[in-house]
Regions:
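Generic detector of well-ordered alpha-helical packing
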Residues: 38, 101-102
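Conserved P-loop
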Residues: 2-90
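Glycine-rich phosphate-binding loops of nucleotide-dependent enzymes
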Residues: 98
Length: 169
């Protein structure tokens, strides 16, 4: 099976959720999935994915706080995560590799766009790659085979409703 490059971007809710949906569908078909989550710590999906640990591996490279100005620690975690994702893409172990919030990590300057473009150009033909996060760079969009932009039409956050465990995290 050929592997393609997908991007889920935009200011709307559902980018990670869409990628996790692909992971679940892939696992249901017996495919092996690696998920690298940038700028995040463990959330509710980790508990659910433990049930599929023979098919889905998930790692996080972040801290609980929202990042406005990246620290050296943030950059080091992002670099570690990028290496882990790169190794997973090239390992021959995984059919699908998800780099969750990679677009934001690039936007914040934690990772280099050129390194990402080189990685995608050299990816094995049979590995599906999914990139998520706001601010997808033009270079990634041009290289991708499928790009979906999530657009917020209405969101309860604007009414003061906070993120809820099990729904948003």
């Amino acid at each position: 099976m050929d592997g393609y490059i997908q991007i889920y971007t935009g200011n709307g809710k559902g980018k990670t959720t869409a990628a996790l949906g692909v992971a679940l569908r892939a696992a249901g078909a017996g495919l092996k999935v690696f998920i690298g989550q940038f700028l995040k710590t463990q959330s509710s999906e980790h508990q659910a994915l433990k049930r599929f640990e023979d098919l889905i591996k998930i790692e996080t490279y972040g801290r609980p706080e929202f990042i406005k100005t990246p620290s050296v620690e943030d950059k080091n975690m992002a670099k570690k995560g990028f290496k882990s994702c790169m190794d997973s893409i090239n390992s021959g172990k995984y059919d699908v590799v998800i780099l969750d919030e990679i677009n934001v990590a690039i936007h914040l300057g934690l990772l280099n766009l050129e390194q990402m473009l080189v990685l995608l150009k050299k990816k094995p033909k049979d590995v599906e790659i999914i990139l998520t996060g706001r601010y997808a760079p033009k270079g990634l969009i041009e290289m991708a085979d499928l790009v979906t932009e999530m657009h917020e039409v209405k969101h309860y956050y604007h009414k003061g409703i906070k993120a809820r465990k099990g729904i948003e995290f």
